[in-house]
Amino acid sequence: MIVDSSAWIAHLRGTDTPAARRLAIALAQREPIQLPDIVLMEVLRGARDAGNFLRLEQAFLTLPRFVPSDPKQLARNAAHLYARCRWAGFTPGSGNDCLIACCALEAREPLLHEDRDFVRIAQIEKSLALVGV
């Protein structure tokens, strides 16, 4: 499973959301979770202070990384997905969402999220599997 920063942040804040609950279950059951670098960056940039940054970094470095087979192709795929969304009349709030979606597509893993944009992206990219919560 690929977990978007929106689900991680809800989990870390202790927010009671479907995605945060599903992530807590996945962690407790040691389900395989791959961490794309872009998700790591999005989580770390929200650290409250230097100490929190270091604690988050240490915790997240224990997760297996998602490593794209070809980073340039991943970037191209994300740009193309973003453009396809725009052509369909929907502009994602962040290009990072398309990059994260393409990580899930390449990994052939479902995406856990707390971000409505992924629902719209999945309507355009039918092979994007979202974790049901």
Residue ranges with predicted function:
Residues M1-L35, R45-Q58:
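Short, well-structured N-terminal submotif of metal-dependent ribonuclease cores
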Residues S5, D37, N96-C98:
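Conserved glycosyltransferase catalytic-site signature
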Residues W8-I9, L40-V43, F118:
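A generic structural signal for short hydrophobic patches within well-formed alpha-helices
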Residues R65-L112:
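Active-site neighborhoods of divalent-metal-dependent phosphate/nucleic-acid chemistry enzymes
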